[in-house]
Amino acid sequence: MTAQLSYVEAVVVGAFQGVTELFPVSSLGHAVLVPALVGGRWAQDLSVSAHRSPYLAFIVGLHVATAAALLVFFWRDWVRILAGFFSSLRHRRIRTPDERLAWLIVVGTIPVGLAGLALEQLFRTTLGKPVPAAAFLLLNSVALYAGEVLRRRVAPVADEPAVPDAEQQHGDEASDNRLAQLPLRRGVLIGAAQILALLPGISRSGITIVAGLWRGLSHEDAARFSFLLATPIILAAGVYKIPELFGPLGAGIGGQVLAGSIASFVCAYLAVRYLTRYFQTRTLTPFAIYCAVAGGASLVWLALR
């Protein structure tokens, strides 16, 4: 990879990562499938299952860039959430919506954080191959469609405003106040759904949005909670593996990492901006169709090669 990955390839991969990390289509699944389908040196250089692949160091930079884009987009929310978190520690109780939302994110992050430390490398090396990724992408399609079916069943509950004067509130703070009404145990369940995204082909944002719909959230609030939950996990995953970026695996690819990270940041920012508006009025169905087509076509292509 050091000698072969061009800046154009780095930018293309970075942009692709930034979009697929937040769209409910699985960035890891695409990171496995696209090089295999393209073939040639991409299949050799861009391998996530190889134990010592330099591509793993490259991905670290992209994860940090994606998390940075989420932090920039939601910076006002994170200022309030962090203030609420430290306020709750100082007063030793949860009193406000911001404090409650902070702890919902904390309890929702712990399960996937522990599972990631224990299982990420095992899943990546054993299942990070084209056929399992395509199969899980099909399963992701089923999950997204099932989420829409469940949403219709609980729609009367989800449409009731959780905050008494919610109709007088507008924008992000109103959504955060609605999210703060979730019981902590539901926050744990929605956050724990991210564990499934360790499987290549299962989307982190998709599975948490589905879990949110299942627990009665609207599409808008489920997507917002999904992106807030994803931020600390994506950032922690990147920071945890930064030594790989500056170690032997990252030798000679600093320029490519920077170029790819810039592309990833820009595309992730545009993606989250688009999706937060998209889910105000629309559903997961188009993404379910895409995953079904992409997963099925990939399986057929791989079988015929």
From Swiss-Prot:
One of its GO terms (cellular component) is plasma membrane. It is a multi-pass membrane protein. It is an enzyme of class 3 (hydrolase). It is found in: Cell membrane. Disulfide bonds: none annotated. InterPro entries: UppP (IPR003824). It catalyses: di-trans,octa-cis-undecaprenyl diphosphate + H2O = di-trans,octa-cis-undecaprenyl phosphate + phosphate + H(+). Keywords: Antibiotic resistance, Cell membrane, Cell shape, Cell wall biogenesis/degradation, Hydrolase, Membrane, Peptidoglycan synthesis, Transmembrane, Transmembrane helix. GO terms for molecular function: undecaprenyl-diphosphatase activity. Catalyzes the dephosphorylation of undecaprenyl diphosphate (UPP). Confers resistance to bacitracin. Bacitracin is thought to be involved in the inhibition of peptidoglycan synthesis by sequestering undecaprenyl diphosphate, thereby reducing the pool of lipid carrier available. NCBIfam families: PRK00281.3-1. This is Undecaprenyl-diphosphatase.
